[in-house]
């Protein structure tokens, strides 16, 4: 769902042809995207595709080996990690979790806990929280310092379907109330947060980008998941003009094979996200029950 109102907003961070190399190997390269105030950008891709590395470049944790990263002066970042190491043998309340990296006024803690719907769990032990409650606690911790940019690494990991919908709705409300930019990382290649403005698919580089399509409004879907799910989730259709082979090489739509896949190797992205897909989707390009288009399987 494209929010055109964000187009003219202040850019918080931008990456231009950015990449990170470690021990002679590129973790990711040729990354280009920006996040503006009030905008939601979602990075998707398989494990090891460079999603977290790209996010770390954006917030300054990882230094680019090539390209450029620009950030708004004085940018405040709130970060929800994919994993948080906690010694579960030590007592740790939700309120104490909020101040692990520095003191916070009680009113700010209470406001953040209220905003994430867990004020009643302020004194609960973290180890006793459900997956969804723990993610809400991490979100509360991230927004308590009023960030300009909120970076969420797999925020719905370990949460069931109804919890995923509730968390995406919460993230939308946080964006709307705080007008912060959101950079969201997701392991799901095909279903994304419906409020996402831009989806960027990575696999060591930018494979494709576009906007999510609304989730199916079929009676079967509505009967199974209800209208709330349709508002929270959306399907993203990949438009790749190449295939990643098991040995790491890249096969292009014309049949040629190269050792790498850079922007000049044949990527082209139209405004609507269509970019000369090399996949065979069948006559109508329908989606299979697993969310992939008919005939599409990622290598």
UniProtKB/Swiss-Prot annotation:
GO terms for molecular function: ABC-type zinc transporter activity; ATP binding; ATP hydrolysis activity. Residues 13-228 form the ABC transporter domain. Keywords: ATP-binding, Cell inner membrane, Cell membrane, Ion transport, Membrane, Nucleotide-binding, Translocase, Transport, Zinc, Zinc transport. Belongs to the ABC transporter superfamily. Zinc importer (TC 3.A.1.15.5) family. The complex is composed of two ATP-binding proteins (ZnuC), two transmembrane proteins (ZnuB) and a solute-binding protein (ZnuA). Part of the ABC transporter complex ZnuABC involved in zinc import. Responsible for energy coupling to the transport system. This is Zinc import ATP-binding protein ZnuC. It comes from Agrobacterium fabrum (strain C58 / ATCC 33970). The lineage of its organism: Bacteria, Pseudomonadati, Pseudomonadota, Alphaproteobacteria, Hyphomicrobiales.
